[in-house]
Amino acid sequence: MAKATTIKIKLLSTADTGFFYVTTKNSRTMTDKMTKTKYDPIARKHVEFKETKIK
């Protein structure tokens, strides 16, 4: 079987609250680390989330 093109990643909050989102990305087209601005309910504001690996 071939290797899957989409992988699961964890988007971890940069506000150091420990909150994260789990999403998928295409590893062939998006080779660099993903960053997104999303809502952190613990900090109660929009902050930047950076990609980390799911362990």
UniProtKB/Swiss-Prot annotation:
One of its GO terms (molecular function) is structural constituent of ribosome. This is Large ribosomal subunit protein bL33. One of its GO terms (cellular component) is cytosolic large ribosomal subunit. The keyword Ligase does not apply. It comes from Allorhizobium ampelinum (strain ATCC BAA-846 / DSM 112012 / S4). PROSITE patterns: RIBOSOMAL_L33. It comes from the Bacteria. PANTHER family: 54S RIBOSOMAL PROTEIN L39, MITOCHONDRIAL, LARGE RIBOSOMAL SUBUNIT PROTEIN BL33M. Signal peptide: none annotated.
